């Protein structure tokens, strides 16, 4: 009986993920079925708080889960995923450790807004606020990663050592360590833990 339940559950999860990978889906990451289900239900739940129809949201918006499990992929491929969502209204859902990166992408690309999941007293209102287009630069609640820090984060995510990074960036190894330390303070974590 347990084997059949496990098999059934695996089939259900696999089927759900395949559905999420279709181009008409508006929630990333395809690997997080709980996030997908929870956010889908939350968007339907806040229907009365938003100005747009649910159909327009499904068509024009992309909601991206920036959690610690997916950060490496987003860091290594930020140009790719930003290109893939071009023309869409992108909403980043940021966990505490990814807030500074979310702010970086908000400032440096065409992101509609950021929902800070860790700070939110009422995530429904925050989500509606962003969907309705009211999120502005003044709403940024935390520091953002600088361009130099982001370059160092990218290189470290690729497995490069500080000495190699210093050579490429034409700076001292001490400067690399300083930028890394500053980024870690903004991300509330050691970089090696985030970019494994």
Swiss-Prot record:
Residues 138-196 form the HTH luxR-type domain. It comes from the Bacteria. Keywords: Activator, Cytoplasm, DNA-binding, Transcription, Transcription regulation. It is found in: Cytoplasm. Gene3D superfamilies: Winged helix-like DNA-binding domain superfamily/Winged helix DNA-binding domain. GO terms for molecular function: DNA binding. Its main location: cytoplasm. SUPFAM superfamilies: C-terminal effector domain of the bipartite response regulators (SSF46894). Pfam families: GerE. One of its GO terms (cellular component) is cytoplasm. Induction: Negatively regulated by H-NS. Positively autoregulated. Also positively regulated by IHF. Residues 162-181 bind DNA. One of its GO terms (biological process) is regulation of DNA-templated transcription. Part of the ecpRABCDE operon, which encodes the E.coli common pilus (ECP). ECP is found in both commensal and pathogenic strains and plays a dual role in early-stage biofilm development and host cell recognition. Positively regulates the expression of the ecp operon. Belongs to the EcpR/MatA family. This is HTH-type transcriptional regulator EcpR. It comes from Escherichia coli O81 (strain ED1a). The gene is ecpR.
């Amino acid at each position: 009986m347990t084997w059949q339940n496990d098999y059934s559950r695996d089939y259900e999860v696999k089927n759900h993920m395949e559905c999420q990978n279709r181009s008409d889906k508006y929630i990333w990451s395809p690997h997080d079925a709980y996030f997908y289900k929870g956010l889908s239900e939350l968007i339907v739940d806040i229907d009365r708080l938003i100005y747009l129809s649910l159909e327009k949201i499904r068509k024009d918006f992309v909601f991206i889960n920036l959690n610690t499990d997916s950060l490496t992929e987003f860091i290594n491929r930020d140009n790719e995923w930003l290109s893939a969502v071009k023309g869409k209204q992108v909403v980043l859902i940021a966990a505490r450790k990814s807030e500074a990166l979310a702010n970086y992408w908000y400032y440096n690309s065409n992101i509609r807004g950021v929902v800070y999941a860790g700070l939110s007293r009422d995530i429904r209102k925050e989500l509606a606020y962003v969907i309705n287009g009211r999120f502005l630069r003044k709403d940024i609640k935390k520091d953002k990663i600088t361009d130099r820090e982001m370059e160092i984060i990218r290189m470290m995510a690729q497995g490069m050592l500080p000495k190699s990074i210093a050579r490429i960036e034409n700076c001292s190894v001490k400067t690399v360590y300083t930028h890394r330390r500053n980024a870690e303070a903004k991300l509330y974590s050691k970089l090696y833990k985030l970019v494994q």
